[in-house]
Regions:
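N-terminal periplasmic "start-of-domain" segments of outer-membrane beta-barrel proteins
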Residues: 1-9, 56-81, 108-111, 125-126, ...
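Surface-exposed loop/interface segments of Gram-negative outer-membrane beta-barrel transport/assembly proteins
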Residues: 180-236, 272, 277-372, 390, ...
Length: 561
């Protein structure tokens, strides 16, 4: 996506005839133009009266679109459902001012940049889900079927209320809730698709590759490496060998919603499964299972209780630099040698691997459980004075395991840890001490817990055509967590089935272990005042004071207007 400049001019790269340009702006009707032979367009957007009256969720506050003075982009429930993204960030693709980059692996976390490169220590935006502060990592645990709306806050006017943590932009997500006075409504959605590479990278074939190596060798005074290149042909297309054209992507979700005069509910469960584009479906996949229960009820005519809870389980497995090796492996090398083992290159001996052998030798898995939710009380103290008290929490438990088997990529190769028959390599030093190579298994268990407590109040009032909306709040929070990890050698039968710390039988002096833990606390005060005159002239003023144990010793507090 792109933005216009101050005068409304814009340019976009890599657009081809037949592509569709989508022009949108908050409060205006979206317009689509199909690219033909023209290279310049005059685009006029028409005001959308309904869109101007739409209420946009900005996190702590909500405003009519017509009264927002800052920069905000929105994604509706209908847009999310039509896109059917695996990760919620994918639904932001193409929004003005939002740049995204991903490596394409199943469930992979993309890089999302909203306000450009703003920090040496990271540019990930802050994520708010139903008022709960999360990070970009947590978006992987959300089921797109549960999403009601997404707002992306992009400038200082809209993000200042979040202080220093909003400096990279803020993504505000609201999940679905049931409607009151509605009978139970059940919904089931399922989808199936297949993924394939859109294009591959052009590389040398075997004949071209051999000719260049011959020229290089002769120019340095050596002999021809390939005396007869006429019989080589195109050789091995390694990208064709590693990529699939039918990688499945499935999604299922079921929900129930409804409510009575004073109560509403929304309950859902979902599953998403994605296999990678690289062969070996058990080596590269992403599976997500979710359960959500949102509930709100009137405890009295002035007091409302809201309870949201969700659980998610993520299972994933990934591969390393397979594509790198496919692009750099010699096309003169076949996939398999004459004896049925994976072939090795005679010209690349230290770093590049046969990518099919690398897939076969790659083992790893991750399992992540997340519980997150909030308990919120909303009290109407006066007609236009509302007080909110909210406790949000998130607990994450992660278990990861990896296995490095005995593997042979050629004598002297950096990754070789076994002989060609996959037996250990033994060495004897001058004193007669014998050492050998080992296969190994590693495991880690991480846990993270965070909570935030918010107490805030908002007051709306008007005097003639002067309209005011005042907000003030207090927040405290804590993040804590830790990890233990270990590795051992000597996995029985050189098998993933026996890759476990308790099963490894190698010597104790080859055993490794480690641990870490962290804790941080923060406290914040914030205030915001919004003013409009007859909904034509707008102004907003925001200030926040943050204190954090993560700040420098002499700067524990700071103001962020």
């Amino acid at each position: 996506g792109t933005n216009t400049d101050f005068d409304g001019n814009f340019s976009i790269q890599d657009a081809s005839s037949g592509d569709v340009l989508v022009f949108s702006y908050l409060g205006y009707k979206t317009q689509e133009i199909t690219i033909g032979d023209a290279s310049a367009f005059d685009v006029f957007l028409v005001e959308d009266a309904e869109a101007l009256d739409e209420v946009i969720v900005l996190g702590y506050v909500s405003q009519k679109a017509a009264n927002i003075s800052g920069s905000v982009s929105t994604v509706s429930e209908e847009q999310v459902q039509s896109l059917k993204p695996v990760r919620m960030e994918d639904a932001l693709q193409g929004l003005p001012g939002v740049n995204m980059f991903s490596n394409g692996a199943p469930g992979a976390k993309p890089t999302v940049i909203i306000r450009g490169v703003t920090s040496y220590t990271g540019n990930a935006p802050l994520v708010i889900v139903d008022g709960i502060t999360l990070s970009l990592d947590d978006m992987n645990a959300l089921d797109p079927s549960d999403i009601e709306s997404i707002s992306v806050l992009k400038d200082a006017s809209t993000t200042a209320l979040y202080g220093v943590r909003g400096g990279n932009g803020v993504i505000v997500i609201t999940t679905k809730s049931g409607n009151r006075n509605q009978d139970a409504k059940f919904s089931f959605n399922t989808s199936y698709g297949q993924q394939s590479p859109e294009k591959t990278i052009g590389v040398l074939n075997a004949t071209e590759y051999a000719a260049i190596l011959n020229e290089m060798s002769v120019s340095s005074g050596g002999a021809l490496i390939y005396p007869d290149i006429s019989n080589l042909g195109k050789g091995t297309d390694w990208q064709k060998e590693i990529f699939r054209i039918d990688a499945p992507l499935v999604s299922h979700s079921i929900s129930a919603s409804g409510g009575s005069e004073k109560t509403s509910y929304y309950v859902s469960a979902g599953f998403t499964g994605q296999e990678g584009l690289i062969y070996g479906k058990d080596k590269q996949f992403f599976n997500r299972s979710t359960f959500r229960a949102n509930f709100n009820t009137d405890l009295s005519s002035k007091l409302k209780l809201i309870v949201n809870n969700r659980f998610s389980n993520l299972k994933d497995s990934g591969l390393g630099d397979i594509i790198f090796n496919a692009l750099n492996m010699s096309p003169t090398t076949p996939v398999f040698a004459d004896d049925g083992s994976y072939a090795i290159s005679n010209t690349i001996t230290q770093e590049i691997k046969n990518p099919m052998a690398q897939i076969s030798n790659s083992y790893g898995e991750g399992n992540t459980n997340t519980i997150s939710g909030k308990i919120e009380l909303q009290y109407d103290l006066l007609k236009d004075l509302k007080v909110n008290s909210r406790l949000g929490y998130t607990y994450v438990n992660i278990h990861g395991k990896g296995f490095t088997p005995y593997q042979f990529y050629g004598v002297g190769h950096n990754a070789t840890n076994a002989n060609s028959d996959l037996s250990p390599i033994s060495n004897t030093d001058a004193d007669g001490n014998v050492t050998q190579t080992w296969n190994s298994v590693s495991e880690n268990k991480d846990h993270h817990f965070s909570y935030t407590y918010d107490l805030n109040a908002s007051y709306k009032f008007s005097m003639d055509q002067h309209n005011f909306n005042v907000f003030a709040g207090f927040q405290i929070g804590k993040n804590s967590g830790g990890s233990v990890s270990g590795s051992k050698v000597g996995v029985p039968f050189n098998s993933w089935d026996y890759a476990d710390l308790s099963s490894a039988t190698g010597p104790d002096d080859e055993q490794r272990s480690g641990s870490w833990q962290y804790v941080s606390r923060r406290v914040s005060l914030m205030a915001r005042a919004e003013y409009d005159y007859n909904e034509k002239y707008l102004a907003s003023f925001t200030i926040r004071r943050d204190g954090s144990t993560s700040f420098g010793q002499n700067n524990k507090f700071g103001y962020f207007p």
